[in-house]
Swiss-Prot record:
Disulphide linkage map: none
Positions contributing to ATP binding: 39-46
Function: Dicer-like endonuclease involved in cleaving double-stranded RNA in the RNA interference (RNAi) pathway. Produces 21 to 25 bp dsRNAs (siRNAs) which target the selective destruction of homologous RNAs leading to sequence-specific suppression of gene expression, called post-transcriptional gene silencing (PTGS). Part of a broad host defense response against viral infection and transposons.
Species of provenance: Aspergillus niger (strain ATCC MYA-4892 / CBS 513.88 / FGSC A1513)
Essential cofactor(s): Mg(2+); Mn(2+)
Protein name listed in UniProt: Dicer-like protein 2-1
Motif (DEAH box): 146-149
Similarity section: Belongs to the helicase family. Dicer subfamily.
Binding site for Mg(2+): 1133, 1263, 1266
Any single Pfam family the record assigns to this protein: Helicase_C
Residues of the Dicer dsRNA-binding fold domain: 565-659
Top-tier EC class: hydrolase
Length: 1387
């Protein structure tokens, strides 16, 4: 699947947006009073309106905002601008395209405006709706007048103000009327001061133009070069030698007989229409007569303006159009069949002109002098990046000029032409001469913006407001009718070194010509005056003003002065967390007092706490330079006082708040203490023993077999039951009774127990026991002291096999058979085999080998093969041994096997004792309900035990990250996300945790030695007492892992309280319990409402915010600069990231099946994948009801209910066209990939890695998921269940459960390929710049991945043309897997 690439990368180098200072100045002025923003075309007036709308939605969300424009085209443009920048706003347009003139019932208007927030319409629509009482002035909270200079005389804009606004203002005061914001580039039409005052009075507003930032305004508005184009006008005689068709048309019209007109004939037939007939005969006006008159007049005008070929084309095309319309039965022009026939008869008699659209000889296309002058001018403007606009007076001229330029040899290969006449009806009632309709110009403006078209011919509809690309050439084919048109058209030429040309006839009256020359001179003088003021400003800036400010930190001697403050402030901002599409530069602005002195204000990036984000200077200065210095000094001083700088007056590079004395990184391997040996303590305890005994009940496949006593010199902790696997069919279960203290025990009894222990150990071994029998731990049968002595006498030692044979003992009471000819090899007795004569029999023993398994804690990996029931199996392990060479132990085999259990019992008992000692020392303040959790947490994987710390370490990692994140977030409300991340990283990094483990002495309790029963020997008192302490080498990662595993064990055993206590034990600086979390750090008061419908959004999220400001903050992107009281979502996203980890961890932990740590890590990596979160963000949509009006051809108005899906991403508050472009391209990819991703998530047995990599969503999509989680967590006072509800509604937890239930394969394709290839595979990803892209970061580069593997000469796989390196790697890996499968490889 091919998906469009994002042209602008969502990386760190993505362009940032920030409102220009003068835009902010005008926005802030609009909050204080009603104003008319007066700025040049292209200087960003609409951005000011956007900021004002957002502010009004926040502060007054229950009233309607009405955006008024003079044209339908401008309505559609402004609506698109608002929808693109505030995508979740409930907005609509009301124009003639909606046939609002037919909405004559109040319920229709009520339904349409219900729950609307912004309406964009023409002035006439609102004026008419108000005049009929459908819309009340009190419903409106803000009215925005685009092109505000129209608010004069009888214009609908002025009607709104005079008939409704001013009367309500006089009667009820300012609270009863909306606020006013006007936008204009030319506040006066006729350059009259009185008109300016009148407009201000009409709009109840004052004109404002940026003053403080005038130089910046001039920087962003480029003045064009004014040029005259002279032409010779058409003489009357030219018509006599010109077009035959035109002359015939004029003749046909002038020679019309009124009596032949179908309308006259109809009136003569009706006696009731005599009066009407008389009126028509006197005026001579009929439908057909008027149509022909206008057609002829337009044709003459075309001839005068463009020439003979143009007039012929216009006439011919119009006639062909008339014929098509006459044959269309669905045409609703209201003319009769007789009138159709009459007009067709007249025009059909005109001579057919010779229209050739493929002429290559310009001389064969007769044109006017005026058009020739235009061609000569355009011929000098054919630069590669040309973009032009030609204004013409009449719609007919526009359509024909576009065709003429498109086919003329001089221009057809140089210009890509289009026409635009707006969306009004124009001459829609004409059946002749109206060659343009709305459908033909639907894509004109967008094609011009993208460069598909580079020359537009338009009427004055493009003078005002319409957002089109800055042009290098603007031509007035007809003189501007007034100053307003002159200024508006001039504003379209905004390219650097652009040209603004006006066409003049050579016989133009000198007074008219001098008027434009005088105006041009006045403009030049005005430009020069601006430049003079700019030079004066630079001269003023050259004044040397000394700013005497100084801050000294006594503890370090660090000094800050006004001269160094700007550089320091720039450095502070430069090291802030970088975000795509957001600027990290400080912004300086200035205000003037009455004495023309300046005071500076600095605004820092939105990630900085609102308390210090905007700082104002304390003094007034003559120069901006001094004001900047002083403002920077005050800002940097406040940053220090706010705790965002170190005592060295530098941004924190290390988290000094942790007050750690040694944060140096440890080497990968360190020398640590040898593992704690509990047998040493027990050996010492035998000198003055406190004897305890516990009874071990042994069951064989569930049936009780025997009981053994374990004797220890000190108290014995509770020992959990053990399961031992003798073979594939035999399982022994060992249950340990509660230990009992023995009051007194005789030395003889101790000695007998040592003998019994030695007997058990020797019975199961072929090795000769050592003579020492001072065992640390003693075992014996469950007998009294007297019975034990008798038992030893009966079962100690062995006897010849022949004696046992002679007694005919039952096999069940026989012991181990030992072959003296083979070094007393132990065998299992099967049966006696007797051969030879009765007087000299040969007695043999059929024996089986004793199982060699020693580590009985693990199941056999391969079950023993079962013999066929009909064919006796002959095992190679069965042997016949002469009885005379054998001895048989007196200890029955049923008791002998216990000797094999002793090593396992002591190994598990040792682990229990180590864990118990750890609980009694380092973890003495923690209470664990089960020692099993501690054993698991301190057992390294290298021990190859039944359990190890890996699962617990996985859980502990999430709990630790979550706890530290919470503490830093609540403890440091002044820290931005960069400090929070750095602080967390320092606390949870392996070197810090390893150091904590060493400082606490935890290293001695980590069990990393593998249990090897064959090398095992029973611990002896004499050996243990003489041991000297040793050291061992251990990985710092193991040390850190055990700390995290103990945290995980604490959480599993006792929840968050236990986990927090465990964390505090190893990391004293982390003490979440002592931090007040009941009151969250709240944003400043002032933003109490979101820009959109909070209630609907919260209902869809599934959580109702007590503090809605948190919801606002969670949706505020770092590029959002207009709200300095709300911090960007980065802090909340930092916290939400940890909350998400906890939610996933909790789900994995609660799953009934115990999931291995490696698989849990893969699952977590898949579920928190940024592209998956982004996909859920794009899918998560609330449904809102809308009402649409449908007008039937008969004029009937019906209301049709509909629903609209509002996705979560639409609620994000942001600024900037580059972010908007990246967002829209990501959404386009989402639309293309949506089906495959949904199928993968719902049905696929594997994770949709490839489809998600192709989505390549910008990070802000996933960020707002995490920031909302953070906001819910804070507002709910740390209730994780509320966060999980949101994740459930989002669909994330539902998919996680499907992964677990259906065992979805989440392994990354690259890892699959590497495992299948046994590591003999190599991936190489290369970024391939687009040759025509200019080589920058946004050059449309693609990625290529090559794969090399063993057994393949050269490159095995090559993948090219991918949008991201991840997509390239995944695609290549999938192809590599296909090759490996073909070879027969498998995982």
């Amino acid at each position: 699947m091919t998906v469009a690439a994002t042209v602008l990368p969502a990386g760190e180098d993505a362009p940032a947006y920030r409102p220009r200072s003068y835009q902010v100045e005008m926005f802030e002025a609009s909050l204080k009073e009603n104003i008319i923003v007066t700025m040049g075309t292209g200087s960003g007036k609409t951005h000011i309106a956007l900021l004002r709308i957002i502010k009004e939605l926040e502060s007054n969300p229950h009233k309607l905002i009405w955006f008024l424009t003079p044209t339908v085209a401008l309505c559609l443009q402004q609506f698109k601008f608002l929808s693109d920048n505030i995508p979740a706003v409930r907005a609509r347009t009301l124009t003639s395209l909606d046939k609002v003139e037919l909405w004559t019932e109040q319920p229709v208007w009520d339904a349409i405006l219900k729950e609307m927030q912004v309406v964009v319409s023409t002035h006439a629509v609102l004026a008419d709706a108000m005049s009929h009482g459908f819309v009340k002035i009190t419903q409106l909270g803000l009215m925005i007048f685009d092109e505000a200079h129209h608010c004069m005389r009888r214009h609908p804009a002025n009607k709104i103000m005079q008939d409704f606004y001013h009367p309500a203002l006089e009667r009820h005061g300012a609270e009863a009327v909306p606020k006013i914001l006007g936008l204009t580039a030319s506040p006066v039409v006729r350059s009259n001061r009185q008109e300016l005052l009148k407009i201000e009075s009409n709009l109840d507003a004052v004109c404002k133009t940026p003053r403080t930032h005038r130089s910046e305004l001039m920087t962003h508005t480029h003045r064009p070069h004014l040029q005259q184009i002279l032409f010779t006008p058409v003489l009357l005689d030219d018509l006599q030698v010109g077009s035959k068709t035109l002359k015939a048309l004029v003749s046909a019209w002038t020679s019309l007989r009124l009596e032949d007109d179908p309308y006259i004939k109809k009136l003569r037939k009706s006696p009731l229409d005599g009066r009407a007939l008389q009126k028509v005969l006197e005026s001579g006006k009929t439908y057909c007569n008027d149509q022909l008159k206008r057609f002829a007049t337009r044709s003459l005008h075309i001839f005068e303006e463009l020439g003979e070929w143009a007039a012929d084309y216009f006439i011919h095309a119009s006639i062909e159009q008339l014929k098509a319309r006459a044959g269309n039965s669905a045409d609703t022009m209201g003319w009769t069949d007789e009138e159709k026939a009459y007009l067709l008869d007249i025009v059909s008699k005109l001579p057919i002109p010779n229209i050739d659209l493929t002429h290559s000889d310009p001389d064969r296309i007769p044109i006017s002098s005026k058009f020739r002058s235009l061609l000569e001018f355009l011929d000098t403007k054919g630069e590669p990046n040309f973009s032009g606009l030609i204004f013409a007076k009449q719609r007919a001229t526009v359509s024909v000029m576009e065709k003429l330029l498109s086919i003329h040899p001089v221009t057809k290969h140089r210009f890509r032409c289009a026409s635009f006449v707006g969306w009004s009806g124009g001459g829609s009632k004409d059946v002749l001469g109206e060659l343009l309709d709305a459908r033909m110009q639907r894509d004109t403006l967008s094609e011009f913006r993208t460069g598909q078209k580079n020359l537009i011919i338009a009427t004055d509809v493009l003078e005002e407001g319409i957002d089109i690309s800055a042009c290098s050439v603007v031509v007035c084919f007809d003189k501007p009718p007034n100053l307003k048109s002159f200024v508006q058209r001039r504003g379209r030429a905004r390219h650097r070194q652009s040209t603004y040309a006006i066409m003049f006839a050579t016989d133009d009256e000198s007074s008219a010509l001098s008027k434009w020359e005088d105006l041009e001179q006045a403009m030049i003088e005005a430009y020069e005056d601006d430049e003079r003021r700019l030079r004066e400003a630079w001269a003023l800036e050259a004044i040397n003003e000394e700013v005497v400010e100084r801050l000294e930190v006594q503890s370090t001697g660090a000094v800050l002065t006004a001269d160094t403050a700007v550089a320091h402030l720039n450095h502070f901002c430069a090291v802030l967390p970088r975000q795509p599409y957001a600027s990290n530069e400080p912004e300086f602005s200035y205000e003037k007092d009455d004495a023309d002195l300046l005071r500076g204000t600095v605004t820092l990036p939105s990630c900085v706490h609102p308390g210090v984000r905007r700082i104002q200077g304390q003094r007034w200065w003559q120069t901006e330079r001094a004001a900047r210095k002083e403002a920077a000094f005050q800002a940097y001083k406040r940053l220090y006082e706010f705790g965002l700088l170190s005592d060295h007056l530098l941004p924190f590079k290390r988290n000094l708040e942790l007050k750690e004395t040694d944060l140096t990184n440890l080497p990968a391997l360190v020398e640590v203490s040898e593992q704690y040996d509990p047998w040493v303590d027990w050996a010492c305890s035998w000198s003055s023993p406190d004897v305890h005994q516990t009874r071990i009940a042994i069951k064989h496949n569930g049936d009780s077999r025997m009981c053994i006593r374990l004797t220890s010199p000190t108290s014995l902790p509770p020992v959990e039951p053990m399961t031992l696997f003798w073979d594939s069919e035999t399982i022994y279960t060992l249950d340990f009774d509660k230990p009992k203290r023995m009051k007194e025990i005789a030395a003889e009894s101790i000695e007998n127990m040592r003998l019994a222990t030695a007997l058990y150990l020797q019975a199961a071994s072929s090795r000769q026991m050592r003579p020492e029998q001072d065992f640390v731990t003693l075992f014996g049968p469950d007998l009294t002291d007297l019975e034990l002595a008798e038992w030893l006498n009966k079962h100690a030692g062995d006897e010849p096999a022949l004696e046992v044979y002679s007694r005919k003992d039952f096999p069940t009471v026989m012991g181990i058979v030992r072959d003296r000819s083979r070094y007393n090899e132990p065998m299992l007795f099967k049966r006696w085999v007797v051969s030879g004569q009765d007087d000299t029999p040969i007695v043999e023993l059929e024996c089986d080998a004793v199982p060699k398994r020693r580590n009985l804690l693990h199941r056999q990996t391969l079950a023993a093969k079962q013999p066929d029931s009909e064919t006796p199996a002959i095992s190679s392990k069965i042997r016949l041994i002469l009885a005379e060479n054998c001895t048989i132990d007196k200890l029955p085999y049923a008791e002998t096997i216990f000797g094999r259990f002793i090593s396992v019992i002591l190994d598990r008992l040792e682990a229990t004792l180590v864990a118990t000692r750890l609980c009694e020392t380092i973890l003495r303040d923690l209470e664990f309900s089960s020692i099993r959790h501690i054993i698991t947490a301190i057992t390294a994987p290298s021990a190859q035990s039944l359990t190890n710390y890996q699962r617990y370490e996985f859980f502990g990692d999430s709990v630790l990250k979550f706890t530290v994140s919470c503490q830093l977030f609540f403890q440091h409300p002044n820290w931005h996300e960069g400090y929070l991340s750095e602080g967390r990283d320092e606390i949870v990094q392996n070197s810090r945790l390893a150091r904590a483990a060493l400082d606490a002495g935890l290293d001695a309790f980590i069990m990393n030695k593998m249990f090897t029963p064959r090398k095992w020997s029973a611990p002896l008192i004499s050996e243990k007492i003489s041991l000297t302490p040793k050291q061992r080498t251990m990985s710092t990662k193991v040390l850190a892992d055990v700390v995290e595993a103990l945290i995980g064990a604490s959480y599993i055993d006792g929840g968050f309280a236990a986990a927090h206590a465990c964390i505090h034990r190893f990391l004293p600086e982390v003490n979440l319990e002592n931090i007040d979390r009941t009151t969250a750090p709240m944003p400043k008061d002032g933003v109490t409402n979101h820009t959109l419908n909070d209630d609907h959004l919260m209902a869809h999220i599934g959580y109702t915010f007590t503090n809605k400001s948190l919801l606002v903050e969670s949706l505020t992107h770092p590029s959002c600069q207009f709200d300095t009281t709300t911090q960007s979502y980065q802090r909340l996203e930092f916290l939400g990231d940890a909350v998400l980890d906890m939610a996933i961890m909790s789900t994995l932990l609660s799953h009934p099946r115990e999931i291995p740590q490696g698989l849990m890590t893969k699952i977590k990596h898949a579920v928190v994948n940024a592209n998956l979160l982004a996909f859920f963000c794009m899918e998560f949509a609330l449904t809102e009801k809308r009402t649409n009006v449908q007008v039937t051809p008969t004029g009937t108005v019906t209301l049709n209910p509909s629903t609209e899906h509002i996705e979560l991403w639409r609620f994000m508050r942001y600024q900037g066209a580059h972010l908007q472009t990246a967002r829209d391209l990501a959404l386009s990819r989402h639309s293309s990939l949506r089906g495959s991703i949904i199928h993968g998530l719902k049905h696929s047995p594997s994770y949709p890695w490839k489809s998600l990599s192709q989505l390549n969503a910008d990070k802000f999509f996933s960020d707002i998921i995490e920031s909302i989680l953070g906001a819910i967590f804070i507002d709910s006072h740390g209730n994780l269940a509320e966060c999980e509800k949101f994740l459930e509604r989002l669909g994330l937890l539902r998919y996680l459960r499907r992964i677990l239930k259906d065992e979805v394969d989440v392994m990354h394709p690259r890892n699959i390929a590497q495992q299948m290839a046994k590591g003999e595979i190599r991936f190489e990803v290369l970024r391939v710049p687009n040759e025509g892209g200019g080589g920058g970061e946004d050059d449309g580069a693609t990625y290529r991945c090559t794969v090399k593997m063993a057994g393949v000469d050269g490159v095995a796989v090559v993948v090219e043309g991918c949008l991201t390196s991840e997509e390239a790697e995944i695609t290549a890996a999938e192809r590599a897997v296909e090759i490996l499968v073909g070879r027969g490889c498998s995982l």
